[in-house]
């Protein structure tokens, strides 16, 4: 799990702990001791805040433990934001679509661990390196049957016009073989309270090119607007400032 630390506090901690528990269940790990995790987070954040004024990246790692047997192992680390984050927040980024090699039905194949937060980042990192070679900063995965899934480290959110012409925020359904984003969930909750319509919908790459804005939403980069997709410039996003503000509000909603 990766959390943002801002103003000396972890953002959306309880949502991340809930996802830690769910991922542990999917991987047949013992249920994590959430109070112990809260104590570890509090200690790490306090020590970070003693020496740093800026934001930090907090990672929670939970494993089965030693190969020889014994109890599970858990630890937390905290460090500075990657250099790429400030630029992606400020300027947006270029992305490419890539076939993930999974059908939508992969969520019914538990041995693939689709939808679990794991340390198996080989495919995600390889995809990001491939994007970099193509001159892009991120990736949007597509299922083998042509539907949008997620980014290697983010959730896809688009803005479009609803039935009455009002803004409508959409994201792929959580029953797809994806990791449901904590930041996306918090964003939708805040957006609904502000009067926005939000929903899940089956989306295809074509929807990205006709949308009124495309964002890759995550705990650290927050809302990175996709301004170029597969080498094609996307239309301007009228809601760019609004979405950025909603995500900022969402970050503190679960404290």
Give the location of each predicted region:
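Helix-start/capping segments and mature chain N-termini
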Residues: 1-35, 39-43, 63, 67-255
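Ordered, amphipathic secondary-structure segments that act as subunit-interaction surfaces
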Residues: 51-61
């Amino acid at each position: 799990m990766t959390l943002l630390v801002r103003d000396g506090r972890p953002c959306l901690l309880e949502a991340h702990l809930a996802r830690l528990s769910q991922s542990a269940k999917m991987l047949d790990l013992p249920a994590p001791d959430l109070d112990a995790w809260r104590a570890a987070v509090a200690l790490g954040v306090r020590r970070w805040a003693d020496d740093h004024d800026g934001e930090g990246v907090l990672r929670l790692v939970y494993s089965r433990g030693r190969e020889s047997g014994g109890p599970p192992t858990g630890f937390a680390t905290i460090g500075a934001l990657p250099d790429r984050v400030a630029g992606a927040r400020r300027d947006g980024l270029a992305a490419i679509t890539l076939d993930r090699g999974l059908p939508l039905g992969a969520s019914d194949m538990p041995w693939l661990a689709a939808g679990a937060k794991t340390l198996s980042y080989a495919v995600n990192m390889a995809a990001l390196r491939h994007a970099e070679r193509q001159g892009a900063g991120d990736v949007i995965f597509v299922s083998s049957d042509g539907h949008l899934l997620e980014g290697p480290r983010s959730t896809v959110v688009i803005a479009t016009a609803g039935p009455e012409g009002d803004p409508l925020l959409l994201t792929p359904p959580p029953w797809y073989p994806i990791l449901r984003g904590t930041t996306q969930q918090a964003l939708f909750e805040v957006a609904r309270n502000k009067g926005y319509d939000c929903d899940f919908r089956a989306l295809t790459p074509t929807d990205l090119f006709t949308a009124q804005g495309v964002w890759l939403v995550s705990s650290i980069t927050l809302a990175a607007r996709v301004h170029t997709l597969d080498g094609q410039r996307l239309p301007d996003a009228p809601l760019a400032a609004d979405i950025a503000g909603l995500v900022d509000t969402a970050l503190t909603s679960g404290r």
